[in-house]
Design a protein with these regions (language model features):
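Non-catalytic, usually N-terminal nucleic-acid engagement modules in DNA/RNA processing proteins
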Residues: 1-63
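Catalytic cores of enzyme domains
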Residues: 60-149
Length: 149
């Protein structure tokens, strides 16, 4: 049931589910204790709107804040749903700043482990929209199979 709800809630977004315990990514080593508890990652990506020249710095900040809020809402909802079904789940928080160390790396790791993109210039780049995606992540032990949408 959880997987169906996840797919429905994320139908307008990039969505991938990966098994981090089988990931070949080098960065998984630094998260070994977390992955032992939460071996699967649900990666959710929201496409950013096209950039405008007018007030681009301000509009970028507003866009990231809005998408961060959306991602926080979605990931908390999904982690609560998984916990209600008896699984462990952790909504990885979105920070106010885009480049926030550990959580930023976890979002990238989850997205590339789910084959939603590849790393270029230290960013996740998707085939569909390049790097214009903001990522959110839920870590869980729920037995939801790997998927890419």
């Amino acid at each position: 049931m959880a997987r169906k709800v996840i797919e429905e809630e994320c139908e307008d977004y990039f969505l991938g589910i990966s098994d981090l315990s089988n990931s070949k990514q080098i960065t998984t080593e630094q998260y070994a204790s977390l992955i032992a508890i939460y071996p699967r990652a649900i990666s959710i990506g929201i496409t950013l709107p096209p950039k405008t020249n007018e007030n681009s710095l301000m509009s970028n900040s507003v866009v990231y804040n809005e998408t961060n809020n959306q991602l926080n809402t979605i990931t908390v909802y999904l982690s609560t749903l998984l916990e209600q079904e008896g699984y462990k789940a952790l909504a990885v928080p979105k920070a106010g700043r885009v480049n926030n160390g550990i959580f930023f790396s976890l979002h990238r790791l989850a997205a590339i482990s789910a084959d939603l993109g590849k790393i270029e210039k230290n960013m996740v780049v998707t085939p569909e929209v390049g790097p214009e995606v903001n990522w959110g992540t839920v870590l869980t032990d729920a037995p939801i199979g790997v998927m890419i949408k």
